[in-house]
């Protein structure tokens, strides 16, 4: 009789991580949180679509490739990067970590025959993947709707001009932002009973990025993401300028940051004890 090969080591950990991720991914795409997240991310798409339904002559005259590129850069940096990505990753990640402790279901995972770091990695992949899917879809739709003002020239701008490259840059920054913020909120959800307070402090920190000295900008997720943008919006007179890192440094830095924060989250999970009598 042929014996079935039982996976072990990295193969077993990979299978367990993907199994947890698939299970948690279903949770991300249901519930009332998804409605608010979807409305938040689709708000720019709806606003831009309304400009086509109720067109203004001034906007039609303003609709050149350069002007629209600058307009989208401002919208992406001020709303999508600072609000859409941040709150989407926060809502989905906190739901998968801290909410399960409040609902008294987290202990099922902690008692399972799997490393706690595997559980953290699977939940993180689900939250980051769902966040990236929602936010990247909003970025793609808003980009196409805005540049539809170019009319027949849109195809040339996308295929022969910088349009497609710019779109890929925005999508890449969005995906990296979802990874970074999902890792941070995974750690917050394991460290504190109320990660919303720490999330609010993080949001405040990212909001005053332009006022921070160059040394403190290095510990901001937003600083590395802004370095990946094809267009960087102008900052106000009170801003403290800092040389943005190269794109390769930003990507590698964000990936390293995510790995370090996830390692801390796994370390915290291994020492975590669930006490429902005090929650």
Predicted features, each with a name:
Residues 95-129, 277:
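Helix-loop-helix units of permease transmembrane domains in multi-pass membrane transporters
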Residues 187, 256-279:
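Junction motif at the cytosolic side of a transmembrane helix
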């Amino acid at each position: 009789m042929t014996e079935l090969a039982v996976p072990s080591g990295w193969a077993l950990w990979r299978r367990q991580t993907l199994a947890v991720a698939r299970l948690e991914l279903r949770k991300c795409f249901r519930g009332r949180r998804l409605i608010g997240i979807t409305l938040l991310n689709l708000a720019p798409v709806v606003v831009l679509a309304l400009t086509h339904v109720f067109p203004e002559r001034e906007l039609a005259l303003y609709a050149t490739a350069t002007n629209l590129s600058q307009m989208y850069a401002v919208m992406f940096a001020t709303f999508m990067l600072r609000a859409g990505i941040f709150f989407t990753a926060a809502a989905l990640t906190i739901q998968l970590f801290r909410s399960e402790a409040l609902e008294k279901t987290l202990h099922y995972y902690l008692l399972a025959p799997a490393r706690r770091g595997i559980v953290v990695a699977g939940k993180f992949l689900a939250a980051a993947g769902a966040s990236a899917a929602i936010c990247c879809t909003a970025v793609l739709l808003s980009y196409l709707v805005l540049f539809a003002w170019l009319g027949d020239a849109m195809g040339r701008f996308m295929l022969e001009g910088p349009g497609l490259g710019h779109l890929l840059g925005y999508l890449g920054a969005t995906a990296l932002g979802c990874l970074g913020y999902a890792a941070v909120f995974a750690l917050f959800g394991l460290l504190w009973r109320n990660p919303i307070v720490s999330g609010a402090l993080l949001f405040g920190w990212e909001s005053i990025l332009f006022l921070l000295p160059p040394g403190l900008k290095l510990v901001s997720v937003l600083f590395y993401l802004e370095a990946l943008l094809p267009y960087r919006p102008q900052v106000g007179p009170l801003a403290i300028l800092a040389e943005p890192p190269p794109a390769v440094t930003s990507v590698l830095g964000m990936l390293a940051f995510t790995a370090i924060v996830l390692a801390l989250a796994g370390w915290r999970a291994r020492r975590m004890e669930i006490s429902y009598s005090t929650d």
